[in-house]
Design a protein with these regions (language model features):
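Metal-dependent phosphoesterase core characteristic of DEDDh/y 3'-5' exonuclease domains
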Residues: 35, 43-53, 62, 102-120, ...
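Conserved RNase H-like, two-metal-ion catalytic cores of nucleic-acid enzymes
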Residues: 55-143
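Short, amphipathic alpha-helical "recognition" segments used to contact nucleic acids or chromatin
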Residues: 3-19
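Short metal-binding segments enriched for Cys and/or His
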Residues: 292-317
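Short recognition patches in nucleic-acid-associated and regulatory proteins
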Residues: 272-293
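Short, cysteine/histidine-rich loop/knuckle motifs that typically chelate Zn2+
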Residues: 269-270, 297
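Residues immediately within or flanking Cys/His clusters that coordinate Zn2+
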Residues: 263-268, 292
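Short, charged amphipathic recognition helices of the HTH superfamily
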Residues: 16-29
Length: 321
């Protein structure tokens, strides 16, 4: 019997969580699918799924957080349809004369390789009152704990937006963290037809976005309970797709935050694996020479040794800019 899209999506969790084949089998059974454990194992093999952390101790990794937020649009008065310049005096106001601004509807997050998808969404009353302080405080706890935060367009949208709402709600900033913006990675490293997350995840055959339309956002702003539940589910799907996309893109990220420094061990700077092979090539700076390695964990070819292996001391450098 042909495997459905939902079944395949469940099986893919084997690749980027700590779930075993038996866990996938039980999840399929709980979802109403009649598959044997043997069939699940064959499916995993046929999809060529493997553990991206097979050569590392994930308990030693820094805290790496996948993050996605959903915000409301800004209600405005407009004289016509189409592209136009909307100024702040065109923003709608409530009965007390207060500007009706955008706010955060929900967030979803996932620690790298962890099975659990975390999320929070406004209640019906909070959505109507435009009160996002509670969900911001729950998100703040994760941001404060994270060493690295990964998001698609996160540097421009998610992280700046959430900090804007922190400021508006009198919430102090979390502890510093590094960021990986997968949109920037896509734009820098590839010439894809589209850099949208939905396009890239479809291209890579990983978790796709749920289908939605603008009315969902309107219903959420009006406090529709079912719409808010759907928004949270949409948000959670995005985070699952984000993690799978990041793992596929990771070997191409030449400027990945150095995990080896955070772990203080001789491991892959991109994924933390200690399974490194020398490739017999070198990376050269203005005055130094470093051995290059290939990582068997994340397949990254960008790993260089820490020690200068040059046999000569070079004191002359170019003064050109």
């Amino acid at each position: 019997m042909k495997w459905s899209a939902e079944e395949t999506s469940i099986v893919r969790q084997y690749e980027n969580t700590s779930k075993k084949a038996s866990d996938i089998y039980q999840q399929l059974f709980a979802s109403g699918y009649d598959r044997t454990l043997k069939a699940v194992r064959r499916k995993i093999e046929s999809m060529h799924l493997g553990k991206p952390y097979k050569n590392l101790d994930i308990s030693k990794l820094p805290k790496i957080l996948m993050l996605d937020i959903e915000t409301t649009p800004i209600p405005v008065w407009a004289w016509s349809l189409g592209k136009q310049y909307v100024q702040t005096h065109s923003m709608m106001k409530d009965s007390n004369g207060k500007i009706i601004d955008w706010y955060v509807l929900s967030w979803s997050a996932k620690w790298l390789y962890d099975d659990e998808v975390l999320s929070d969404v406004l209640t019906s009353k909070e959505a109507i009152d435009r009160n996002d302080k509670r969900v911001l405080e729950s998100a703040w706890k994760l941001l404060d704990e994270a060493d690295i935060i990964i998001a698609h367009n996160g540097d421009k949208f998610d992280l700046r937006k959430i900090k804007a709402r922190f400021l508006s709600n009198g919430i102090m900033p979390p502890m510093p963290y590094k960021t990986i913006d997968t949109l920037k990675v896509a734009r820098k490293e590839f010439a894809l037809t589209s850099n949208k997350q939905d396009y890239i995840t479809r291209l890579l055959g990983v978790q796709k976005k749920l289908d939605t339309d603008f009315q969902l956002w309107v219903d959420c702003m009006n406090g529709d309970t079912e719409a808010l539940k759907k928004m949270e589910e949409y948000n959670k799907h995005d985070v699952l797709g984000l993690e799978q996309m990041y793992l596929k893109l990771r070997p191409y990220i030449s400027g990945h935050p150095n995990i080896a420094v955070m772990m203080e061990e001789n491991v892959c700077s991109s994924c933390g694996s200690d399974s490194l092979n020398s490739v017999g090539k070198y990376y050269y700076t203005g005055s130094s020479k470093y051995e290059l390695y290939y990582c068997n964990g994340c397949m990254s070819p960008h790993i260089r040794g820490k020690n200068n292996v040059s046999e000569k001391n070079i004191f002359v450098r170019s003064a050109a800019k």
